[in-house]
Amino acid sequence: MIEFDNVTITQPGADRPVLDGVTGRIRESDLCVVVGRTGSGKSTLLGAINSLVPATTGATMSGRILIDGRDITGTRPRELADLVGYVGQNPLAGFVTDTVEDEVAYGMEQLGIAPSTMRKRVEETLDLMGIAELRRRQLVELSGGQQQRVAIAAVLAAQPRVLVLDEPTSALDPNAAQDVLSAINTLVYDVGLTVVLAEHRLERVMHTADSAVWLRSDGRAVFGPTADVLARADVRPPLVELSGVLGWPSVATSVRNARRKVQDEGPHVVLPDLPSEPVAWSDAGLTRVVEARGLTVRYGSQLAVSADLDLHAGNVVALMGRNGSGKSSLMWALQGAVASTGTLSIAGSDPRRVGDAEARTLVSLVPQTPSDLLYLPSVGEELEQADRESHAPPGTTRAILTRLGADLPDDRNPRDLSEGQRLALVLAIQLAARPAVVCLDEPTRGLDYQMKHELAAIVRRLADDGACVVIATHDVEFTAQATDRCIVLADGDVVADGPTRVVCCASPGFSPQVAKVFHPHDVLTVAEVSSALAAQGLAKAPA
């Protein structure tokens, strides 16, 4: 269905191709997942399938891409609308109308489709994506998962043969992600569409993917069945990592598959059982740095969050909950950056009633898009500015950056850094004032598994140095690996609060894959399984 014939793509100003001699084939009606480290060229490959690359990027391209036998080289993206549908990472940014029904119809209007045909297709597409009841809703009022399904519906109305999705679940909570992926599976298995998607959280999609494309760091690509490709790839989701630790000859791609392998292939490691009664969170021996009572944020008549909260030094705390549950609003309220009511004390002061200089010593916040805080042309200038604004000795922020494990040249433009490097730079800038509380809003978006491991080590060092680290996230695997305590929000209220392993194991929606594989045993991560194997003489502990 899709053939890549020696495709090489070089971005403007780059000294080497991001894709180099890519050759391979994706079969018709496959669900194909594109995998690779951050910056390996996944978005570039997806963009090339509908000619967004090189048409809109200024990149140079050689080789050919054929879709259903048609050479699309040099074709304008608009001319491929009936062949390839494309949905980018931020569906809301791509909407051009106000309501769901208008958005689904818009693309067909631009293609000049007859009104009678258009009306029929709109109805069919709304039903197919399960959004018929949303037809008159304002797009901005929809949840993230609903917006994603509308974006897919809008391109499906033109009846393309191929659907390309760039990070379709990266901004979604686990349940919303499952809704979107269920809709995608329907398109593949019931409609026969060919779907190509990139997704950093492979644990969400690899169990249903028919095939995979691994983009290597040298620009080359490996095509093949999902399990075979993941066994070789340099990105290792939890089940793939677990397969290696347990010595299985083939990787498990689903929880069901892994549970069966544990029974049939072993090794049969002894693990503790979950406690019969939930263990409550205890602050014994901890120093309280945050005390909030009735902390409430409203946007007009809409209640965003209302919470009583105590947070402690040396702890890493996860804020979880569905999209719109109040996680980001709570963190902005802790920083004093949004209007709120109720009492708030951080290290003895209320950040809403102090000057900017003192506020920096109370709470720092790294937003979902860290680059929003970078506005100078070089890393060195950003570091020097942070020292001045924090009234810190020269070199303070550079020393923090080094401690975070990022050795970035002073002359590098922040816009040229990887996602992980930008996150480390912004975190160092925010830490220059030595805040008591460090807030991170969805820090794992755009990070591959190795970068998540590095981020987990960073936040643990921050906590060990005495900070309270608060992380708003949908990433249950990262939560299991990096946090001590988990607070779940729903409609602005705290509905669960306790040790991470207790809260995560109590809810299927927030359980990491390893916990599901070994349920009812008390284990959250591959590292815990590896340690148990080593303790029982069944395997060596990781170096």
Predicted regions mapped to residue ranges:
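H-loop/switch region of ABC-family ATPase nucleotide-binding domains
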Residues: 199-200, 473-474
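Conserved ABC transporter NBD signature motif
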Residues: 58-70, 342-350, 359
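Conserved ABC ATPase signature
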Residues: 138-142, 146, 413-417, 421
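ABC ATPase C-loop
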Residues: 155-156, 431
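ABC ATPase nucleotide-binding domains
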Residues: 227, 231-288, 510-543
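Catalytic Walker B motif of ABC-type/P-loop ATPase nucleotide-binding domains
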Residues: 163-166, 438-441
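A short, surface-exposed alpha-helical micro-motif characterized by mixed small hydrophobic
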Residues: 205-207, 479-481
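Conserved ABC ATPase "signature" region
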Residues: 116-134, 392-410
